[in-house]
């Protein structure tokens, strides 16, 4: 992965984003779909198409529609019915009612089905008799649902790599130190739990939290004012206007003062749709005071090799050196060394010198850069900054005039630094949009833009590209059969 991190290589699929496009998009079970197009040499090639916003693999969501398709009323009705059948079996209000009834049961009657991931009332016991069932569910366990629920681990859609206690505590301490009193937790259930546990203990200062997450299972444990079923890739509230108003009311309390957005999206997700949704959440926060020039602050957890993409969406963001670690990820854990360290960092528009990283973990303050850096991040006097991205000491290359990874060497044939065993030559270099050799696609002056002048994100996705290729004749009958069964 070291040779590919931060690469501009792509397969020519881009996503077009604007409110008008999303409002007009057909819906799949995950809400409005996104509009994609294949681009080559700066021009659109072929037809635009709609695909699921949350699932990049069509095995997870098979929705596909050409933009110019004429969809019959019968097919629209079948699609609507299909989407409804793939929604949670109960409304949030019904889940809340079940939760109240569950908490009133004696300890011996509180059961949880591990197979179905569901709290069981006595009337449900018989239908789950052959399943793996946990008994004696305590009230303290109900306050930590992320430890009861199995994490969803599809990294391209709804991956749940849950914060380790170390990182969760650091975030909590930072929130308190910076004076925030309301936290919008977008895809961060562990942090939401910690904030609520702290509130139950009567800790001061009091902090409130609202969880937005695509995992509807949390509806079983939280009131409607504490959780909203939400897709962060298309800004879709599954609970409709009522859920949207819950979020807006939360953000606008005390005229929006003391609010913070903390998010931890799936690492396989597209950056620009995420940024588009976060900007819309900012707009919800700003509604009460449109004249306010400030923005809702954001802490965004994402791998460091997406830095350039995030900065293109949020130029005022800074990447912190803090390494975020997770309980249920084999590699993203604290204490590992070299390239085994977690690549997940915090991107934020908050002043980096105000976010104090723990000295006990080796972080120190660089007075020149005016931010905290990890022990391996040495200040380069030539670059005039602490240049390391991955925690290892980087070295300065005078020919490239920048710092590079310690394992890289300068290649005179390619005229840049790379891994020693890299393939030499000019293949793959330059811009695939216009063919220019002096820049990459992301810096192309002929870049295609959306209706609002925003840069369109390139979709690094082989699955969609593969799905557009012609299939062998032997598979044609199966495809037609699937098309009849799946609206």
UniProtKB/Swiss-Prot annotation:
Annotated binding of Zn(2+) 3, by residue: 366, 369, 379, 386
DHHC domain residues: 381-431
Keywords: Cytoplasm, Metal-binding, Methyltransferase, Nucleus, S-adenosyl-L-methionine, Transferase, Zinc, Zinc-finger
GO biological process, one term: rRNA methylation
EC number: 2.1.1.-
Binding site for S-adenosyl-L-methionine: 160-163, 190, 213, 231-232, 264
Enzymatic class: transferase
Residue ranges of the region described as Disordered: 445-487
Free-text domain note: The regulatory loop blocks the catalytic center by bridging the methyltransferase domain and the C-terminal CCHC-type zinc finger, resulting in an autoinhibitory conformation.
Residues that hold Zn(2+) 2 according to the record: 113, 116, 128, 131
The name this protein goes by in its record: rRNA N(6)-adenosine-methyltransferase ZCCHC4
PROSITE patterns: DHHC, N6_MTASE, ZF_GRF
Zinc finger (CCHC-type): 429-446
Gene that produces this protein: zcchc4
A GO molecular function held by the record: nucleic acid binding
InterPro entries the record matches: DNA_methylase_N6_adenine_CS, Mlase_EEF1AKMT1/ZCCHC4, ZCCHC4, Znf_GRF
Assigned GO CC terms: cytoplasm; nucleolus
Annotated localization: Cytoplasm; Nucleus, Nucleolus
Record's catalysed reaction(s): adenosine(4220) in 28S rRNA + S-adenosyl-L-methionine = N(6)-methyladenosine(4220) in 28S rRNA + S-adenosyl-L-homocysteine + H(+)
Zinc finger (GRF-type): 28-70
């Amino acid at each position: 992965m070291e040779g590919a991190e931060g690469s501009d290589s792509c397969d020519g699929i881009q996503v077009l984003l604007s409110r008008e496009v999303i409002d007009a998009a057909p819906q799949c079970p995950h809400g409005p779909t996104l509009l994609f197009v294949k681009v080559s040499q700066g021009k659109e090639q072929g037809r635009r198409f709609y695909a699921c916003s949350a699932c990049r693999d069509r095995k997870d969501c098979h929705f596909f529609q050409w933009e110019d398709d004429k969809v019959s009323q019968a097919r629209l009705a079948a699609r609507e019915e299909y989407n409804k059948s793939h929604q949670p079996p109960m409304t949030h209000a019904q889940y809340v009612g079940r939760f109240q009834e569950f908490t009133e049961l004696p300890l011996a009657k509180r059961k949880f089905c591990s197979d179905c991931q569901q709290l069981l009332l006595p009337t449900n016991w018989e239908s789950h008799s052959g399943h793996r069932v946990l008994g004696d569910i305590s009230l303290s366990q109900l306050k930590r649902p992320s430890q009861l629920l199995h994490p969803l681990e599809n990294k391209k859609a709804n991956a749940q790599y849950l914060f380790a206690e170390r990182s969760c505590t650091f975030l909590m301490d930072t929130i308190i130190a910076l004076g925030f009193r309301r936290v919008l937790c977008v895809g961060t259930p562990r942090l939401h739990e910690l904030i609520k546990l702290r509130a139950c203990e009567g800790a001061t200062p009091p902090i409130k939290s609202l969880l937005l997450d695509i995992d509807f299972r949390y509806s079983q444990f939280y009131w409607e004012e504490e959780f909203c079923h939400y897709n962060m890739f298309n800004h879709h509230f599954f609970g409709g206007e009522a859920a949207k108003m819950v979020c807006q009311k939360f953000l606008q309390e005390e005229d929006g003062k003391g609010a913070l957005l903390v998010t931890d999206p799936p690492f396989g997700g597209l950056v620009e749709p995420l940024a588009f949704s976060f900007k819309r959440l900012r707009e919800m926060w700003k509604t009460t005071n449109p004249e306010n020039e400030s923005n809702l602050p954001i802490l965004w957890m994402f791998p460091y090799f997406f830095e350039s993409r995030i900065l293109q969406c949020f130029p005022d963001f800074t990447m912190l050196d803090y390494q975020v670690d997770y309980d249920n990820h084999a590699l993203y854990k604290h204490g590992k060394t070299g390239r085994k360290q977690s690549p997940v960092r915090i991107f934020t528009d908050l002043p980096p010198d105000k976010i104090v990283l723990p000295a006990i973990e080796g972080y120190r303050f660089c007075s020149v850069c005016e931010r905290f850096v990890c022990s391996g991040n040495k200040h380069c006097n030539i670059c005039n900054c602490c240049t390391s991205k991955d925690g290892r000491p980087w070295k300065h290359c005078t020919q490239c005039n920048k710092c590079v990874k310690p394992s890289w060497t300068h290649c005179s044939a390619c005229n840049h630094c790379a891994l020693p065993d890299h393939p030499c030559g000019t293949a793959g270099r330059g811009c695939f949009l216009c063919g220019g050799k002096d820049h990459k696609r992301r810096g192309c002056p002929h870049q295609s833009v959306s209706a609002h002048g925003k840069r369109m994100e390139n979709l690094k996705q082989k699955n969609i590209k593969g799905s557009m290729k012609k299939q062998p004749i032997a598979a044609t009958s199966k495809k037609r059969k699937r098309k009849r069964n799946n609206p």
